[in-house]
C-alpha cells in the first residue's frame, strides 16, 4: 500500500558502547548449552533451523495454500514476540561438501569406478558452486531471568515447530553449540577455519564462547564497506517502493552465486494500536480534503477536484483499515537487510550491484547503510538482535509475499545413488531408494527425453557402488550390450531361442504353511487365465480341470497327497 511506503525509525534504542575487541562487537551476553541466548537488555532468544519445501514447482492451487499457511504462521507472533528470519548463503569448504561413497572392490571394474567417482565429484563441485543455503527463524522474549525465559521460550518453540509441521516443513531447534557453529560460519567467510568447540573446554581454558567464534579482526572505519578477517563486506537495506510485490524477489536473491545473508527482522504491531493509527490517518486525510475544498471554493473552481495523491492516500487508507478489521490481516514493522561478503572489494561491488539489479527489477531499491555497517552486520547474525533503526510498515499479505521456500533438496547419505541435478537449485540429487518406505521407482517422460539413459546410469551406479543383484527385463533388447560389458548374463526368451521358462518347476523345500502344490496350482491357474481366459476369464469347469491335472502331474513327487 502506498500509505505505508514511508519508513519509520525506532524510538527505543539500546546503548552499545564502541567495541574495543572483536568479541565485544558480537551482540550477545551469554550463550547457554540448551540454545538459549541472552541479548542486551534482558532479552532471550532461541533459533530453529528449517528445511525447504517444493513451492516453485507446485501448482497454482498448492502455491496459494502454502502462501495462506505462511500468512497464518506470521500471524502467530504477537507484539510481545519479535522474530528474525535469516537466510544464510555460505561458501563451504571442499572437505565439508557432499562425499561420494563408492569404495574400490579390487576387481577389474575399479578403473570404471574411479572414472565414475571423478564425474560425480565434478557434478558436486558445479552444484551451486559450493554454496550452502540455510534458513533459520529466531524469536525473542523479554524476561527478568533465565528461569523465567526458559519455559516461555519452550512453549513458543513447540508452537513454531507445530506451525512448520502443518506447512509440511521439517525443522529442528538448535542447541548452543549449533548456534555457535552458525555464528562462526557467518564470521569466517569461505569456511577457511573449521569450528572447534566443546563446552568442556571453557573451564579448562578460561575462554568464553565468543573467543571460539570471533574472527581475527573487524574493521568498520569505512562508510560503505567493512572488513571481517581478510574478507570484504557490505551491509544494505531493501527500500520497498512497489505497491505490489512478487514472490520471486527473495528467491532470486538467494539463488545468486554469492556469499550473503538476507535478514528480515519483524515486529508485530498491536492490532488495536494499528487500527487506531490507521483511523487517525483517515481523519488527517479527511481534514486535508476539507482544506482543499475550502481552497477550491475561495478560488472559484469545483470543490470535487482534489489532488491525485490525496485521493490515492484516502483509498489506500480505507482498504488497509478494511483488511485489518475483516480480512485477518495484521500490521508488521519490517527491517529487510542484505549483507554481502566477498574475498575482494571488486567482487563485493559486483555482488552488491547484482542484488541491486534484482531489487530494481521488482520496483525496490537496495540502499547502502552509510556509516552503519557495523549495525548492519551484527543485525545479520542469527541472534535476534536488530541494530538497524529502519522499518517499513507491512500487512500480513505483503510480508508473507517473501516466501522462504523454493524447492526441496534430496541428498541422502550412505550408498546413495546419483539421479541428476535439481533444475531449480542446481544441486545434485543423491538418494538411496532402499531406505524409503517403498523402494519402487518409475522413469516417466516423452519419447527421446532420456528415460533409457537414466535407467542405464542408475544400473551402472548400482553395479559400481553396491553388491545388489540386478535383473533387467528387456523386451526391446536395449540393455544387452551394457550387461555383457559389465560381465552379466544375457538370457534370451523368444521363439526359437535355446532358453525357456519352465512354469511347472516347483520348489519343494518351502517353509510355508501352504503346501508347494497348492501354491503352484494357484500360480498355474493365474497363468492359464492370463493366456487363454479372454475377457470373461476361465469358467468354473475349466478351473476344476486345471486344478485336477496339476495334482495328477505332480503325483509322482508325493506332494499334497
Predicted regions and their residues:
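Generic recognition of flexible, low-complexity loop/linker segments
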Residues: 34-35, 123-126, 250-251, 323-327, ...
